[in-house]
Amino acid sequence: MKCVSISGVKKFVLKEKNKPISRDGSVIIDVKSCGICGSDIHYWLSGQPVGLIMGHEFAGVVVDSGSRSDLKKGDRVTGLPISPCMKCDACCSGNYQYCSETWTDAVGLSLDNSGAYAEYTSCRPDMIRKIPNGVSYDAACMVEPSAVSLHAVNLASIKIGDTVLIIGGGIIGLMAAEFAK
C-alpha cells in the first residue's frame, strides 16, 4: 500500500509499505478520508519522529473486522486513535485520555501504529465507531477533534450568560466556540 511518512524537517516521503494485518483483533480500515491535526503539523515542522505515518482523524470502510462480530466488511467507520489500558482509575471512570498508556500505541501518533496517511490503517476494536448513514467520511473525521473541543468546554463548566474567551482559531477553537454557545 502507499503511505506518507515523515522523512525530515518539513519533509514527507511517499513510500510503499505492507498493508496492515489484524493483530490482537484489530480492525483494518480502507481509509477514505483523513484530517490534518495541529499535532501533525508540529511533527512535520520538527521532522520527528522520522518514519512516522501520521493521521489520527480518519474514516473509512472495514476490510477486516478483527474481533468485532458486530462489524462486517464494507461498514463505514471512524476510530478513536487512543490505546487506553481499560483497568486504571481513569479508564474505569471513562476518562481514557488520562490513562498513562493511552498514547503508547496510538494510531498515527506512535511509530508502532501507523496512521491514516495511508491507504489502510488498523485500530483497536473497542475504539471503532460506526458512521451513521448520511454522514460523509470527511465529516466523520471530525469525531476526534470534536471530542477534544467538547471535553474542554465541559471542563470549563460554562453556564448560560457566561462570557467566554477562546484562544486559537484552529478547528479545536472553532468547535469549542460552537459548543460554548
Where are these regions (language model features)?
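Cysteine-cluster motifs in flexible loop/terminal segments that predominantly coordinate metals
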Residues: 37, 71, 80-129, 133
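Mid-domain Rossmann-like dinucleotide-binding core that forms the NAD(H)/NADP(H) cofactor-binding site
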Residues: 135-181
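Residue-level recognition of beta-strand termini and adjacent short loop/turns
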Residues: 8-10, 23
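Glycine-rich beta-strand-centered segment in the early N-terminal region that forms part
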Residues: 19-34, 45-92, 132-134
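Short Gly/Pro-enriched turn/cap motifs at secondary-structure boundaries
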Residues: 7, 18-19, 50-55, 108-113, ...
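Cytochrome P450 core scaffold surrounding the K-helix E-X-X-R motif
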Residues: 39-43
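Residues that mark the start of a beta-strand
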Residues: 2, 26-28, 163
